[in-house]
Amino acid sequence: MATDPSQYKFNHSMLRVKDPKRSVQFYEFLGMKLINKLANPDAKFDLYFLAYDSPKAVSHGNHWTDREGIVELTHNYGTEDDPDYKIANGNTDPRGFGHLAISVDNIQAACQRLEDSGYKFQKKLTDGKMRHIAFVLDPDSYWVEVIGQKTLEETESVKETDTASYRLNHTMIRVKDAEVSLNFYKDVMGMQLKRTSENEKNGFNLYFLGYGAPTPEASANGANPLAGSEGLLELTWNYGTEKDPNFKYHDGNAEPQGFGHICIAVDDLEAACARFEEKKVNWKKRLTDGRMKNIAFVLDPDGYWIEVVQNEKLKARSNW
């Protein structure tokens, strides 16, 4: 069977966490549901998969491999009791991973709810010049951006927020060379460039990529046209990094650890990996390597890990 990249899904983003109880509680407070847990007591780690799953959710009721917008939390046993164990969130040196982002119905009310519950903010809505976004901190100080599905003016007097309408909108990573990374994610991974935001004054550009139908560049009410989506990858490029031969971003898997990988679910795992081989990708783990024959890992141009798994709805392969 051939493989069709238009059938791929940006399935999840993996973060290591110190204390899974606290972290699961936080993401559940954001409206997510624990849709799967893979316990690995022999190897002393557990995996928690959280996603939006209300009747209003994009992937309501779907198998975990047939979704976009999942957060995978990895817990290595014992870290919760180690006073010296600390996660690297990617936003202090060494930098790399930037943030997750949720889109919400009424951003002012959503941020107030988070603040009222005692969660800390890296940036409140009212801080700085950018009054349309906020960043809340999860229990390990990973940044979670909060963006609105409507304009600020539409929601400024609304006091309620419905977490069932939220989306896990995107995952942001920093890249050294925008042209190289865009070519990789489009040509090799089969994503489409859905939106570009150029910030010449501040010396950086943002690129939003994803699978599925093309998205319009503008919306009628001026809100972000991608805010209702899930499964977007945001690449942040700071001008000039591509010219520095010694410049390198941190992949999150070397020490100090934090972010682990992004994952795509494909229509046919063997055929997809054969196509990646033809594209001459750098492998972290081929499908046939090691004991786990149901996952592969590709390296992107910055060395970030991309897990590849079978979408079990399209072809049953593993009993996850």
Identify the residue ranges that each predicted region occupies.
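Short, low-complexity disordered segments enriched in Ser/Pro/Gly and basic
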Residues: D4-Y8, W64-R67, N91-F97, T161-R167, ...
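Short, polar loop/linker segments at the starts of domains and inter-domain junctions
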Residues: P83-T92, P245-N253
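Short mixed-charge
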Residues: K56-R67, T215-A227
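Conserved beta-strand in the GNAT
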Residues: E72-T74, E145, E234-T236, E307
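Active-site/binding-pocket entry motifs
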Residues: K56, N76-E80, L152, T215, ...
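Amphipathic alpha-helical segments
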Residues: K18-L34, R113, D177-L193
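Vicinal oxygen chelate
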Residues: A2-S6, H12, N36-A39, D46-D53, ...
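Hydrophobic, helix-prone linear segments
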Residues: M1-H75
